[in-house]
Amino acid sequence: MQAPQPLIIAIVGPTAVGKTAFSLDLAQALNGEIVSVDSRLVYRGMDIGTAKPTPAEQALVKHHLIDVVNPDQEYSLATYQAAAYAAIAQIQQQAKQPILVGGTGQYMAALLEGWSIPEVAPNYELRARYEQQAASEGHAALHQQLQTIDPEAAKAIDPTNVRRVIRALEVFHETGQPISQLQQRNPPHYRILTLDLERPRDELYARIDQRVDLMMREGLIAEVWALIRQGYGWELPSMSGLGYAEFRPLWQGQQSAGACISQLKFNTHRFARKQGAWFRRLPKRVSLDARHTDLLAQVQELLAMPEHAPIHTDH
């Protein structure tokens, strides 16, 4: 009789839904370690704007793939995927439970679905041309260009995510093949349980606004200024993301702090809506109401089912 495959638990959900607190409870209950699945937590020095788990939280449970590179270093999806699979194997070898936690849907899908990611080196000259086109013609025109050559990728990529649109165009330019065809699926040898935390939208928005207000009290603007003064420019992928780009008009004297904060709240609401589209497509997904106080007990009931029973390996 073939031995069951080891179990991977994934915790997903929109920003501010409560993933961090729940993941710490679950990891402690299951003798687990956490693998961060967040494209922004890899950057050192970007702590407040990314809502990075605090040093105290990281001391409670070991976390992997946090503070991996400096904000000006490139960290591709392929690099992340390889590092995450290595972290999962390391956790399993210690007879502990790997728990994937994060809100970057593309990264989570790449792990759980086993994407075969094309190794295409960046063409910075080509990227600059596309960026210039986006600036002059608008992001919708660039997305329409992708729609023509790769409708499947265009459907999956938000038109406002110019960086991802450009990457898809770049891959087609360099290989002559659509990125959607190159991203083949080779599911990893794990059993998967995906826990999707949800809250009513009005409550989630209120929590987002409270989080942004907390970030301001913790010194988010000072963190952004420190990064700029260290030479990390606004054009970097790390600095053009949520929580940082909103303060560029303040730095340039074009908007007040209050206007930038309002924009950050608005952008985070929009981001939270988009996250759900990724999570709904993930394998073996179970929706959980994050308001319930017995979440841990609910998950332990799921884990009591034979198909979800944790199995540790020592290979």
Swiss-Prot record:
Catalytic activity entry: adenosine(37) in tRNA + dimethylallyl diphosphate = N(6)-dimethylallyladenosine(37) in tRNA + diphosphate
GO MF entry, a single one: tRNA dimethylallyltransferase activity
One Pfam family hit: IPPT
EC number from the UniProt entry: 2.5.1.75
Gene Ontology biological process: tRNA modification
Region (Interaction with substrate tRNA): 38-41
PANTHER family: TRNA DIMETHYLALLYLTRANSFERASE
Similarity remark: Belongs to the IPP transferase family.
Protein name from the UniProt record: tRNA dimethylallyltransferase
Natural source organism: Herpetosiphon aurantiacus (strain ATCC 23779 / DSM 785 / 114-95)
Gene for this chain: miaA
